[in-house]
A protein has these predicted regions:
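A short, Lys/Arg-rich alpha-helix, primarily the initiator
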Residues: 1-28
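Recognition helix of helix-turn-helix/homeodomain-like DNA-binding domains
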Residues: 30-50
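Short, basic-rich loop-to-helix N-cap that marks the start of a DNA-contacting helix
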Residues: 45-60, 76
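PLP-dependent enzyme catalytic core of the Aspartate aminotransferase-like
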Residues: 61, 188, 264, 445-447, ...
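N-terminal small-domain helix-loop-helix segment of the aminotransferase-like
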Residues: 103-204, 211, 378, 390-394, ...
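Conserved core of the PLP fold type I
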Residues: 166-296, 313-327, 334, 494-495
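Conserved core segment of the aminotransferase class I/II
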Residues: 329-405, 415-417, 500
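Conserved glycine-rich beta-strand-loop-beta hairpin in the small C-terminal domain of fold type I
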Residues: 388, 404-415, 426-440, 474
Length: 506
């Protein structure tokens, strides 16, 4: 008979008392302690064995002997988990387990297939470790401000001056000044047939992605999304009732979309396709000929195009960003951009959505967009007030992405350092803040990329995002953000090289 493990005894104790993971977490809070969902899940699944103090907390909650819980009890055999009857005081878990008067509330089944690992279980574990005093280097999210990137002074000054006038709601689409500046910027980018009434500001691009998916997709409608993707696209399409279908981007071709794979996945249920250009997580910038090929696919199959272009002002190495909408005047196109990345103001939450091209064929979709836009009243007005200033005049982001600039030099360093690690291969990113290296899964014996991310976190205190978090099917990639200062990146890449020098997943 297989030897009983800690997780076996933990599950047995929970089953004997009709206690679930959420009950244990609540009971720990009543005792003034903190157990994270990811932390508890790992104990139950057997991925992690807790430290003695955490085991004592679990034993107290479940009213069992901690020695039995940690190491087993030969006298117990297959008997029920032994209670610790020495405690005279009432116990929080007993109240939880005995309560049958209140029904339980589960999350909506609409969330069953929603994935967003950029802030997921590994991040929860990192938060738990931070709560215990560990210092974690966060290479998992493109948030410039914590790494010393500052908002342009002129933008801050402008917001301060306009703040007294930003106390009320704006037009649901956005301030006139903001939409006018966005329209002019869109015209410079070559977007055809752009009108003020078809420009919408949002609390970041994220809100507008969700809004547009809800406006377009009926249950079962298919939408083509790249793999790897920014996972919010897949999550929002799923939440809206749609069916995301992932087309491959080819690592051997600088991560450009595989047009044959894209077209092979189109069915009668396909309504639209998404491109992310410049791409997150790969940093790829699509050339005009690739974009023209995508337009031809959309044209042949009468698809709407959604273009996530939030990183369009962060191109390097002479690469020029071309907006796909500028190549498709006859097709319905929705283009997303904003200031979070280019102006280092992710916390301000200001993005926009521009509808261009053939607007007659999407008139009903536009009615849906207007309805949902009205329902949320408006995006935050103080952030809208600085769009005109931010898009005009000197663009400080250019100083970051040219040779000698901080983003440019840090990108180069991380690319070269990763290229030197045995078992790691990587395509050089041409834009944005991210790099998406590939691991030799045979060399490192990797079958579970989430476990790899946890192992790296526990050993080196480095937080990355696994490739699976970007809807990449194989467990062989991960994403690194190269925003930390150079001295921090040097230390972290040394740690990463040391980790891969000996790592073999068990």
């Amino acid at each position: 008979m297989a030897q009983e493990t800690f997780s076996d005894r933990l599950r047995q104790a929970m089953s004997d008392r009709d206690v679930r993971q959420s009950d244990v977490i609540r009971a720990s809070e009543m005792l003034g302690k903190k157990l994270g969902k990811s932390q508890m899940s790992q104990y139950v699944s057997g991925k992690t064995i807790p430290r003695r103090d955490v085991a004592e907390l679990l034993a107290r909650i479940l009213e069992v002997d901690v020695t039995w819980l940690l190491a087993g009890d030969a006298d117990q055999g297959e008997a029920s988990s032994p209670r610790n009857d020495s405690k005279p005081e009432p116990h929080p878990s007993a109240q939880i387990a005995r309560s049958t008067t209140m029904r339980t509330f589960s999350k909506s089944t609409k969330l069953d297939n929603v994935l967003y690992d950029v802030r997921g279980p590994v991040v929860d574990e990192a938060a738990r470790m931070e709560d215990e005093g560990e210092r974690i280097l966060k290479l998992n999210i493109g948030n410039p401000a914590p790494f010393g990137f500052r908002t342009p002074d002129e933008v801050i000054k402008d917001m301060r001056q306009q703040l007294p006038d930003c106390e009320g709601y704006s037009n649901s689409r956005g301030l006139f000044s903001a939409r006018k500046a966005i329209m002019q910027y869109s015209q410079i980018k070559g977007l055809p047939n752009v009108q003020m009434e078809h420009i919408y500001t949002g609390n970041g691009v994220s809100e507008l992605i969700q809004l547009s998916m809800n406006a377009l997709l009926d249950n079962g409608d298919e939408i083509l999304i790249p793999s790897p993707d920014y996972p919010l696209w897949t999550a929002c399409a799923t939440l809206a009732g749609g069916h995301p279908v992932h087309y491959l981007c080819d690592e051997q071709a600088d991560w450009y979309p595989d047009l044959e794979d894209m077209e092979s996945k189109i069915t009668s249920a396909t309504k639209a396709l998404v491109i992310i250009n410049p791409n997150n997580p790969t940093g790829s910038v699509y050339p005009r000929e690739v974009l023209e090929g995508i337009v031809e696919v959309a044209r042949r199959h009468q698809l709407m195009i959604f273009a996530d272009e939030i990183y369009d002002r962060l191109c390097m190495d002479g690469y020029e960003h071309v907006s796909i909408a500028s190549l498709a005047p006859d097709l319905p196109c929705v283009t997303f951009s904003g200031l979070s990345k280019s102006h280092m103001i992710a916390g301000y939450r200001i993005g926009w959505m521009v509808l261009s091209g053939n607007q007659r064929c999407m008139s009903d979709f536009i009615m849906g967009i207007n309805m949902l836009s009205n329902m949320r009243l408006c995006s935050n007005v103080p952030a809208q007030s600085i769009v005109q200033t931010a898009l005009g005049g000197h663009q400080s982001v250019n100083d970051y992405v040219r040779p000698g600039g901080r983003v440019y030099e840090q990108r180069n360093f991380v690319y070269e350092a990763l290229s030197k690690i045995d078992g790691i291969s990587v395509v050089k990113p041409r834009a944005a803040f991210y790099i998406f290296p590939k691991m030799d899964v045979k060399k490192f014996n990797i079958t579970d990329d989430e476990q790899f991310a946890l192992d790296l976190l526990h050993e080196k205190k480095i937080l990355i995002t696994r490739g699976g978090g970007f809807n990449w099917a194989e467990p062989d990639h991960f994403r690194i953000v190269y925003l930390p200062r150079m001295e921090v990146l040097k230390e972290s890449l040394e740690d990463l090289a040391d980790f891969f020098d000996h790592y073999r997943q068990s």
